[in-house]
Amino acid sequence: MCVKNDYDILLVVILFWAIFKQNGTALTTYAEQYTNRNIPESMAPVANKLGFAETQKYAKDSVWAKDAQFRKLKHNQSPYKIWDYPDYFKNDANTSDYPMGASLQLWNTEIFQSINPFFVVLFTPLIIVFFNWLRKKGKEPTSATKIAYGLFISALSTLVMVFAVYYSSNGHVKSDAVWLITSYAVITIGELCLSPMGLSMVSKLAPLKYAALMMGGWQLATSIGNKLSGVLAKNWDVFTNKALYFWLNFGLLMLAFFILIVLLKKLNRAFTTD
């Protein structure tokens, strides 16, 4: 029975990682193509010295022909090039302010990958203090309940991106970086509620002779989630309305959340018995 409970946890974990791991795929694409990455002039020297900046020249060049959603256009089944401005300026509302040939300083797309680790360091002690405070008041949720909270909070992060798409008119104008940063902040809180608790429950619920096996199962679930994340991200260009893509992510996380809610009493009982 304990092993069966572990399987239940691993199932919802797969769906969580499938969404979370899109920080290296869909969210990076959103940062590159749909996010305003202009660096304020006052910060540009420091950003350059730290290697956080890239230069984009506002001048026409030979570029791939793309539609409004940055999908390559084809002629006779083959992509083709046109004489136009770089992709970054396709949905930049400020192009009228740029002199021809101007060099803009932009935040590297890769910088957004560091947001999650930054928030992990920032939020971890705060969450520990919060749960310790609840424990002293006798109101600390169970490990399974924390995982459920983590799934729900993570789902909210995808709603942030839905609003970002609406705010930017489905990418016709660039959205503020604050949307992406907020989404990372929210899903990091969800990660800190779910990942440590899930790993702890899997190890504690498994019989001693299966402990190593179930720890391997956790890694396998993470791996499957990574694969599913890639499958989802591969279909990014299928969605003309990018809000629908993030609604799909929201739906998958809420599915995992409701699955866990249904199993919550059984998991809490098994954990208490253990």
Predicted regions and their residues:
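Disordered extramembrane loops and terminal tails of multipass alpha-helical membrane proteins
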Residues: 1-184, 188, 195-199, 205, ...
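Conserved short cytoplasmic inter-helical helices of the MFS fold
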Residues: 209-213
